[in-house]
Amino acid sequence: YNNPEKFDILKKKVDTYSEINKKTWSDDFKKKSKDVYDRFADKGIYMSVHALSRMPRLNKSGYPEIEEKDILDILRGQPNYTEGEKKLIFFDQEGQLVVVKNKETDDIISIVRRKNPKGEWDNV
């Protein structure tokens, strides 16, 4: 590849798929994880294997139901917190949704549900 950016994107996908393939997940879950990765990657959003593993567990009782669209919407905004040197925190209190992005790689490293901000988060 002559285009370093395209090469980096392809390498990220190959590395992510390889990491998924090494998991002891069911073949169905591996396929779903790769499909989610591709849907977000098509929008320029790259998810870690950890974040992908969290996706099916996001809708749980006691929390408002969310869809992939809600994650995309929160990421269109600005992070409202940071955690440590490397983490940008996108927190939607109404949706009780947290998306954590690595400041250096720009990858989504985790997605969790929480009702309130974490004490160690710093306001942006």
Where are these regions (language model features)?
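Ribonuclease/tRNase effector modules and their secretory precursors
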Residues: 1-124
